[in-house]
Amino acid sequence: MNNWKKLAAAVILAGAVVMIQGCGGNGEEAKSMEKGRVWKAATEAAYPPFRYVDENSNLVGFEVDLLKEIGRRTGATIEFRDMPFDRLLDAVAGKQVDMAIGAITVTKEREKLVAFSDSYYRLSGYSLLVKKGNPPVRNEEELAGKVVAAKRGSTSEARAKAQNPKEIISMDHYEDIFKALEAGKADVGITGDQAALYELEHGGSSRLSLSGTIPTEDNFAIALSKDN
């Protein structure tokens, strides 16, 4: 039984006392086994509101709080390691870290490389953003023939590539998607709905417009080594 998967599922879905299954022991026994342990968690610290660095140089956000709560309930310490998004799964598979969290969508292709916890968040859609005043891009089909800015290695990038765009500009950081739009380097940017909303609510609405959405039911989960 995958201990990490049991752990994540217990916190995320049940909201009950976290239990790590171990040698048939009960939750308290399993918790005592993890007390004092340091778990290395890979993430890309630039995707608000899920995770980002605040004005005090602290890593914060929903996913950060989630892992800290898992650590609190088990007596373990979470040690975050910042790295590019497209390296997260390789870091887990190569056992450089114990887990990765970072709005990682569960896909069949990714399941060949790593295991996943139960989902902790369901994405309702991808947002299509354009520079304020530019023609709207309303849906997935209208990406055809457009220059699209997307996050490197993301499922949103894969969705955009499937629509025969003129060009995909792959960005290492989500904020670079917004900068590319503002600079006129891309016709449209694609990102998760909550990330787009956060940008628009924190000053982006003066420069960018939400012009369309792509419905989806992608699930985010914690990536874990298949050997755990």
Give, region by region, the residue ranges found by the protein language model.
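Bacterial signal peptide processing site
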Residues: 24-26
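Short loop->beta-strand "edge-of-pocket" segments that line small-molecule binding or catalytic clefts
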Residues: 39-43, 140-153
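C-terminal motif of bacterial Sec signal peptides marking the signal peptidase cleavage site
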Residues: 18-22
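Short helix-initiation/N-cap motifs at beta->coil->alpha
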Residues: 64, 79-92, 135, 155, ...
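Periplasmic-binding protein-like
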Residues: 45, 122-130, 193, 197-228
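Extracytoplasmic small-molecule ligand-binding "clamshell" domains
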Residues: 31-103
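Flexible hinge/capping segments at coil-to-helix
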Residues: 30-33, 130-148
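A ligand-binding cleft/hinge motif common to bilobed small-molecule-binding domains
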Residues: 90, 104-113, 159-162, 182, ...
